[in-house]
Amino acid sequence: MNIKPMLKIRLHFQLRALLLCYVVLCSAITSGAQESKNSFVFPLKNKKFLNVQVCSEQVIRVRLAAKDDFTPTLMEKYGILKTDWNAVKASSKMEIGSRIIQTAGFQFILNEDSGELSIKDAAGKLVIQKVQLFHQESQPLCKVLGQSLEQYFGKEKHGGGIIGDANYTGIKSETDQLGPVPSVLQISLAADERFYGGGSTSRTNIQHRGEALRIWATYQKTEIPMPFLLSSAGWGIFNNTTYLNFFDIGRFQKDKLFVYNTSGEMDFYLMLGNSMSEVIKQYVTITGKPYLMPKWAYGLAFGGNTIENQFDMMNDAVRFREEKIPCELFWIEPQWMAKNYDFSTSKTWNQDKFPGEPFWEVNKMPKYEHPTLFVHKLHLLGYKLALWLCIDHDMTIAAEDAIAVKNEKPQSGQEHWFNHLTNLMDQGVDGFKLDPGRTLDEHPERKYYNGSTDAEMHNLNQVLLPKQMQETFRGHKGIRAFQHYCGGYAGSQHWGASTSGDNGGGKDALYDQLNLGLSGFVNTSADVLEYVTDNKAGMHLGFFLPWVQINSWYSLHHPWFMPPIEKETFRYYAQLRNSLSPYIYSAAIEGSQTGMPIVRAMPLAFPDDRKTDNLIYQYMFGENLMVGVFSDSLYLPKGNWINYWSGEKMEGGKTVHCKIPENRGGLLFVKSGAIIPVLKPMLYIGEHPTDTLVLKVYPEKQSTYTLLEDDGISFDYEKGLTATTKFTCNQKGGQIDFVIGGIEGSYTGMPTNRVYELEIAMKEKPQSAFVNGQISTGWSFTQTNILKLLVNEGNTSKDIRIVIK
């Protein structure tokens, strides 16, 4: 809750008085700065050392220590943060009382008199005016800010367990949350700066100026916090700590950002970019590019009720196909295990409900996918299979042993939890759902194998869990797995997918999707249809998420158990989603390269439009589709937009109110100029070859779209084995020039020829169509003013030019 007005005033004036007498830690620099490869160490008069590492032309790292010994953090040690930075041309010089570190991208200025830091871009423009570092020696600042944060958040509540776990009570106890030796980083803010990111730490805003964020993974509250903030001014900060930390963004003082570390450490990265999207790219370069799931994983995943058995699930699988509702994957909740909630490494199939192997072969090795049992039968129907897991294990054992192997040192000899899952992989399991039980729980009494306590390990555990899961699957199968976990921290985006956990598929989940996207997390989803009062509205949001999860673990979310209108709505959205798979997967590949999310918050997509600063109930789904949720109105940015349901073209720069059709759940608009690749209907991704592609074109002056593709399953994309196809549309007067670019790049299984079916929205019927200068007779014009043109691309490496007159 907010602090009381009188306390706020008292703290404000107390702080102003204290600032006059504070000893800033970096109050003076002695001579003799040490320089090594892209790293500069400055000894300070107070016996501390400041280390500035130039990571790239846009990224610098700043560390403060009592000794000139800047050892790797656990995030580096365990392979979560990038350490293999390329050499950057950087120089250090003295100029009018300041030490200046210069690269082609920025100037880092350290004032010798005040100890303050500032950042300028390559052109000399001031990006960050003032950065000050306060440590435990400056207790008044740390204490006053800490008191204010405790008033704001209240006493921290711990314990209670995870829903479904046998240990779950829901009863939480209050404890103090601020450490005894904090450090504070203070950054001056420009008057009009807005701030985004922080992971899933706010369910009231996506623009965080004026509030504080608590960076600690907490069940059902802040499950994937990210110690990362993104400024609208084109810079960002990553606070490199796994201890409890806070961002106070213009709340305590309107013109200040405070980074409060409970551990006393000070280690942060500053990133510069010409746009917010560039800064996100820098952040995921540091913490890991987003994971690219297998192509099929971007479709619908369905989890049945916990009392279902193999026959119920197989009947569901057949019913989806009969109802012509595309679905990619089934997962099984804990009932697949012989022992419910089995945390051990000796778990076996529940032979009464889900016999994944013949009972007489339980002890037989090696394991294999049995051709007559349910796993193989699912695969024959085109489905994938995932299993629910719960984990309660010290993951530093495997992490430390990996380092020991690399250094040719003895290993621990202790158990690595994930290794036993390889038997299930051999039996045909395609992925895993990682439950938060015990991992999102706190373990204040636990001493980890690496010597750390839970204060340092709790946030880090949220990354090690999906990391070790992915590494195990990849090491054993050599292909991409489907795995997701509702917890996370910095770096989690690199190791798998996420959901909003046990928070349903309503407005809370929406905030999580937007805030995580603004933090470089691409593969987000929710428990679609849970905790929603309007099923159609829940479907509208759910089917326009990066991947779709229907979790019916205690419910009956099967579409055939819905009223007819809802069942038909479900079918429509599932089919639309399936047809959009080339568009969605292309956005996923882009995200894996740049950190650009599939669900794009409006201020990220339209940063120069101040009306989008804190828009919640709408977002861009990829580059060209705008989704409005839980409302019949939305704001259209400047330009022209097409109502997808009605076909009506509308001018932007205003808020519009539109009728939502009875069999739809929200608003959907197409950006004028859009080119959207879709597939013809399939029951699952990969049912038919993708050598025929439909292009939905909405001409508006000149526009382009680039389709990204790869093999959809291997890790070859990491080697650059992807392909791009650029489409260009130029509308001038009554003529449309459309160019299908030749495919650039390659991947295994890439089509050598392709058929394009163009569907071009037009005002009136054209007179003629030409393909590569030859008049075409293979076109028609519909009553809804859509020109349909068939183009057979005999050689995918060559351009095709189409002219419509």
Question: What residues fall within each predicted segment?
Answer:
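Catalytic and substrate-binding clefts that recognize carbohydrates or anionic sugar/phosphate headgroups
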Residues: 92-294, 304-305, 310, 317-322, ...
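Solvent-exposed beta-strand/loop surfaces of large extracellular or lumenal domains
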Residues: 74-90, 643-663, 768-790
